[in-house]
Amino acid sequence: MSRGIIIIGSGFAARQLVKNIRKQDAHVPLTLIAADSMDEYNKPDLSHVISQSQRADDLTRQLAGEFAEQFNLRLFPHTWVTDIDADAHVVKSQDKQWQYDKLVLATGAAAFVPPIAGRELMLTLNNQQEYRACETPLRDAQRVLIVGGGLIGSELAMDFCRAGKTVTLMDNAASLLASLMPPEVSSRLQHHLTDMGVHLLLKSQLQKLEKIEAGIRATLASQRSIEVDAVIAATGLRPETALARRAGVVVNRGVCVDSYLQTSHPDIYAIGDCAEINGQVLPFLQPIQLSAMYLAKNLLGGNAPLKLPAMLVKVKTPELPLHLAGETQRRDLSWQITAESDGMIAKGMSGEGQLRAFVVSEDRMKEAFALLKTLSV
């Protein structure tokens, strides 16, 4: 008798995998185990909740029970997996255990909180539960410090500013989105945020936070201090790898998988933000969607290696949206930038004259798909 497939996690990757499995097999036993409620919500919406005056419960799209009925699943919400016995094919919680034929880790990634004095005063917005826990202080806060000027930090800074709050955006780097693109490309967004009223503290490092009567005092390494009502950590994500380590599979930055999404154990797979695919961590929607398609086939007996095409990454800053693709972080590219009132096109060219990366903004985003076709990968 088939023990079926167990998926640990209930986020976007887990749900996409369930949908793809059920397209091919309506009856294989499917069990999902997760620490949260397993209700569905759209994670990118978290970048806009404050300006849209949305509460955490407003984000829910489908209740867990409806999901289970629709796709013929066994769900175990609010359940912490404590151990995986890979040789015995058993998943354990504090009071239950489940046997499996195939196991999929879809455990996601956790927000990184800098290890500074007062770190417990930092809020994170990496999932619906985290927003639910801090929505009242965030809605009430007038002065907000966002630590981290990457994708999420930039999106949140614009959103809080649009909601009428006084926003300070801090980063160690000399420019925003520094891990994704050079300053001459990100400067358009940087200038727009400044024009909106966002106060940028670049080349700045947070040293400590302390509670004071008027809110929170944030002290920088330069010994300058600012007073705010709330501090948000947007300093990146760290793949959740603890369960994989307990199962004895190979872990690097994420759970190491090959082109078949298979870990070092033949019956354990990983997908989504927790996975490191052939050395790459790809915490974006499109690679997760494609991974789910291929993994569903392989779990059901197929043998199809994942092939990822050139893909767009979207920066969700509504007043100056950006799309980017390719190796935008490469330092050896020569950038050709055309900036006009309706938007920007920035092309990253190799020494051989090949298009290796591009960034487009505003009305020029309509040219993204044509550029994708000419991108050298």
UniProtKB/Swiss-Prot annotation:
Subcellular location as annotated: Cytoplasm
InterPro entries found in the cross-reference section: FAD-bd_OxRdtase, FAD/NAD-bd_sf, FAD/NAD-binding_dom, NO_rdtase_NorW, Rbx-bd
Coiled coil segments of this chain: none
GO cellular component: cytoplasm
Pathway where this protein functions: Nitrogen metabolism; nitric oxide reduction
Catalytic activity: 2 reduced [nitric oxide reductase rubredoxin domain] + NAD(+) + H(+) = 2 oxidized [nitric oxide reductase rubredoxin domain] + NADH
Pfam families in the record: Pyr_redox_2 (PF07992), Rbx_binding (PF18113)
Gene Ontology MF terms in the entry: oxidoreductase activity, acting on iron-sulfur proteins as donors, NAD or NADP as acceptor
SUPFAM superfamilies cross-referenced by the UniProt entry: FAD/NAD(P)-binding domain
Keywords, ordered alphabetically: Cytoplasm, FAD, Flavoprotein, NAD, Oxidoreductase
Homology family: Belongs to the FAD-dependent oxidoreductase family.
NCBIfam families cross-referenced by the UniProt entry: PRK04965.1
Functional description taken from the UniProt entry: One of at least two accessory proteins for anaerobic nitric oxide (NO) reductase. Reduces the rubredoxin moiety of NO reductase.
Name of the molecule in the record: Nitric oxide reductase FlRd-NAD(+) reductase
Organism: Salmonella paratyphi A (strain AKU_12601)
